[in-house]
Amino acid sequence: MSLFGAFWDKDPNPVGHGQFGNNKGLFFNLNWYPKGVLHIGAWDAWEAKQYAHYCGNNSVFLEANPNSYNRFKNEIEQFDQKIYNLAAWNEDDLEMDLYCPDHSQDSSSLVEKVGTPIKTKTITIKTLFERENLSFSNYDLLNIDTEGAELQVLEGIGENISNFKYIIIEVSDLGSDFDKQVNEKITSQGFSHVRDSTHYRSSVTSKMFCDKLYVKN
C-alpha cells in the first residue's frame, strides 16, 4: 500500500487523514485520477481493487517473490489486471537471489541481504513492455516499492518514465547517497518532488524510509 494512505476513500483501510487532514484518498487530494497504473512490487495486491475503481483492468503489477505471487495473484486477476512473477531490474533474464525476511515477507529484497534467499528472474520494464506488447502511453501512474532496488528499476524504465504523470516511490534509506541518486534520477527526467509521506524506521534494516510523491513538470 502507499504510505500516503488509501487511494480511494471508500476503502475500509486507513485513508489519508494522517497525511492530508481528511478522510479522502490520495487521488481526491491530488484532484487527479489515473487512466492506468504500473505497480512494481505487488506484495498482497491491496491496491488492485482501488485501481480497478478508477481505471478498470488497465493496471500492470510485478512481484518478484514467487510465494507472494502465487498467494496473491488472484487479488489482481479478479479485476482482469495483469501480474508478472518477475523482478524489475536494470538487466534482463538474470537469475538472482531475493532475500525474504522470515517475519516480513513484504520486505523481500534483491539488495538488502536479510532473510532466506529464493531465486527470481529479472527483467527491465522496457523489455517487459516490448515482450508483452504493452504501451507506456496507456499508463500515467508509476508506483515502485522494491526495498532498495529503486534505482535499478528506474534505469530499466529509461526515458519511458516521461509517459507518467505521477510517481510514488518508496525510498528505503532516507538521507543516504542512494536516496539522493534516486531523487536526481527522477528529477532529471522532468519531475518535481511534491512531498514525503510520514517517515518510518524499518524493522528489518533499521533504516528510515518513506514514500515520495513526484509530479511531471
For each feature predicted by the language model, list its residue ranges.
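Phosphate/nucleotide-binding beta-alpha loop and adjacent structural elements of enzyme active sites
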Residues: 1-217
